[in-house]
Design a protein with these regions (language model features):
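Active-site-proximal helices and loops of the catalytic beta/alpha 8
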Residues: 1-69, 96-97, 106, 125-153, ...
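Short coil/turn segments at secondary-structure boundaries
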Residues: 76-77, 118-120, 166-171
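Substrate-binding cleft of secreted/luminal carbohydrate-active enzymes
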Residues: 6, 104-107, 111-125
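Carbohydrate-binding surface patches
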Residues: 173-196
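Conserved, mostly hydrophobic/aromatic
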Residues: 1, 84, 107, 119-121, ...
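Active-site clefts of carbohydrate-active enzymes
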Residues: 68-95
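Hydrophobic faces of well-ordered beta-strands that scaffold small-molecule active sites
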Residues: 1-3, 22, 78-79, 116-118
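Short, solvent-exposed loop/turn segments at secondary-structure junctions
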Residues: 6-9, 83-87, 122-124, 188-190
Length: 196
């Protein structure tokens, strides 16, 4: 059972209520770091203030998130970039699809269950609810095919490397000057290093 909890969900994740929650803490960290200067901080999805994050601040948020739950719980959290209750990621970052690509790569390489909200993979935009719940653009001429190809490759990367699904997580670098964050996923028989 996946619950919709926008904050620290430890009391619901003790093994007697929810198995996982929609990981809005993950969402806000991704918006803050990958959205950078293009992030619209005037929006308050779920009542939470959005904040731009340096690489160091992002690393601190990720470490806090990883320390919040037992590892087995972390591995099943529903990691989302967009949802039905908030503006879509690409809309919150001023249409910056490169920011969406970086966040998606992080989502597909981070512990937990990645959740792609329908339409994000083709560049669908949408503002606050009900704008975030628009109909899927079935006309393929409206799709960002480059973005769709990127999503497919990122998903295949996760599928083809067990360490990205079950491996341990280790932060390696947070460089504010370069705006870089790096981490490793360690599992048998491989260790993968991701630099964003």
């Amino acid at each position: 059972i996946v619950g919709e909890v926008w904050h620290d969900a430890r009391r619901w994740l003790q093994g007697d209520q929810f198995d996982a929650v929609m990981n809005y803490i993950f969402n806000r960290a991704c918006l803050g770091f990958f959205g950078g200067e293009k992030l619209d901080v005037s929006k308050r999805p779920g009542g939470y203030r959005l904040k731009r994050l340096t690489a160091t601040e992002f690393a601190q948020e990720i470490n806090r998130l990883l320390d919040l739950y037992a590892w087995e719980v972390t591995l099943v959290q529903l990691n989302l970039l967009s949802s039905h209750d908030m503006p879509r990621f690409v809309s919150l970052v001023g249409g910056d699809k490169d920011a969406l690509k970086l966040a998606t790569l992080f989502q597909m390489t981070f512990p937990g269950a990645p959740c792609v909200y329908y339409g994000d993979e083709v560049g669908m935009r949408g503002g606050s609810d009900p704008g975030s719940r628009g109909g899927f653009p079935w006309d393929e001429g409206d799709w960002d095919k480059d973005l769709l190809t990127f999503f497919r490759r990122a998903i295949a990367l996760r599928r083809n490397h067990p360490a990205l699904r079950r491996g341990q997580y280790a932060g390696l670098l947070a460089d504010d000057d370069q705006g870089l964050y790096a981490f490793a996923r360690k599992g048998e028989p491989e260790t993968l290093v991701v630099v964003l």
